[in-house]
Amino acid sequence: GRMNKWAALACLTRVYLNAEVYTGTAQWAKVVETADQIINSGIFELAPDYSDNFAVDMDYSNNKEVIFAVPYDMQYAAFGQQHKWYPPVANNHFGNFKDYFWGGSCANPQFINAYEPGDKRLEKTWLTGKRYHYQNPEEVVWECINYLPSLTCMRDGENNTNINWGYRVGKYEYNYETTTGQWSNDFAYFRYAEILMSKAEALLRQGKDEDVAAQLVSQIR
């Protein structure tokens, strides 16, 4: 929760990456410079599992990918109402909630289809396919079915209008026991993966070291 040198460098990397948008002058070399300071420190590395970055109880002793996170705790400072944001409105059976979800933002088919077959990030980022009752793994409470050009989430006997369509964000681990929609997941503001991707983009924007850029991206893929 405390900003330090590495969080500051991560912030600079992000600012330099977008410098041309803000000032009209690109700063690709500075992106590489600040990113290299983080990379060469040897402190950070990608988490073994992508989902580790969004767990209810972040284990920072084993997760070296998160450079800076905003801490949240259901008892002292909860990440308020986030559980309600993502699932479709009709799906109030997803957990131990006492009211309905809000049916927040969702992905369109073109974005979902951009994932390559077998890419685990799809299932770890989006609520897709059959979803089961949190206490009964055999009870299907929600199923996403691909009815192009819309991705429709349907449940028998419930409202299946447009407000319930689309794949919802599911990368943050759900606390199925909460009754309020609040959670304790820390918000990972700067991650090592972003630094690798930023350096790769900066190299390509300068027409340099395409092989190095490919290696950086491949670490994440």
Task: Give, region by region, the residue ranges found by the protein language model.
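Basic side chains
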Residues: 5, 12-14, 84, 121, ...
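An aromatic- and glycine-enriched ligand-binding surface/loop that stacks and positions planar moieties
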Residues: 2-153
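Extended, leucine-rich alpha-helical cores of fungal transcription factors
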Residues: 1-9, 21, 184-192, 196
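C-terminal substrate/ligand-recognition segments
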Residues: 128-220
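Long hydrophobic alpha-helices with heptad-repeat/coiled-coil character
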Residues: 4-18, 206-221
